[in-house]
Structure formats: structure tokens, C-alpha cells
Amino acid sequence: MCIRDRIIRAIPLPPISIKKGPVPICPPNRQVKSFFDKIGSTIEIKNEKLSINFWSTSGMMASYYEMLRVMSNWLVKKGIKKQDAQKYITSLFLALSEDAVVNSKKDLKHLVKESQTPKGLNHQGLNTMSKKGVYKSVVNTLNSIHKRLSQ
């Protein structure tokens, strides 16, 4: 439980080791924010109840890495050297993530729309994954993690 001005809850996630990524803190505190801003991007959360929403999304890190691994392995099975496959996939997703950060003041649906052309490859990928329920599964997983944290 966050107690104003006495206990500040902070959860620096593993990418902090490379001085990247968010550090949610609860409740907001100028000194703690100043400290964590030196090693990441501090996100100030008003109360403990709201903070659980952020902690829930941090439970998706392994799923993200698994997606990178699956795509990299798919390239390897298609004859690409493992090192080249991993470099391509990780570089692609780094660029996409950096683009998302640069455009983070815009609604993310803008990036979804701008990254596809009608009947193009990205349109096909998005529609196939939508029809297979991939994004609903992501929401269900987040809800499951949230429920666990709320107990």
C-alpha cells in the first residue's frame, strides 16, 4: 500500500540495466522521480489501485521475447542463419518500438493504420492475427494477471 510521502513503491524492470524503459512509482514523489529519471522513464502513478494496471502489463515481457524468438526461428527454418535472423527481428522491433515512443503522444491506432496498405502484407498479418483471436488473448492474459495482482 502506498503511504503518501513515506513509502514510495517503484518497480524498475530488467531493461533498466541498459538505462531503458519505464519505472512506475507510486505515489508521485519529486525526489524519487529525479533519481529514476537518470536510469529510465519514470511514470508517476496516483495510487496503488491504479498501479496494478501497470504491474499487469509488465507480466508480458516474456511473451514479447517469445514472439521475437518464434519469428526468428521461423526465419531459421526458411534457411536464414540464426545470427542474421535474430539480428533482423530484434532490429526491426527495436525500430518499431522507437517509432512508437517518438509518436507516443498520438493514439497508437495511428501507427496501426499508417503501417499497412490495403491488401498489403501488414494488412494481411493484422487481419489474420485478429481473426485468430491473438489480440483478445492478450487482453484475456492481462486480465488474468491483473486478477492475480488484485487478490
Role assignments for model-derived ranges:
Residues 1-3:
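Short, small-residue-biased leader/transition segments that mark boundaries at the very start
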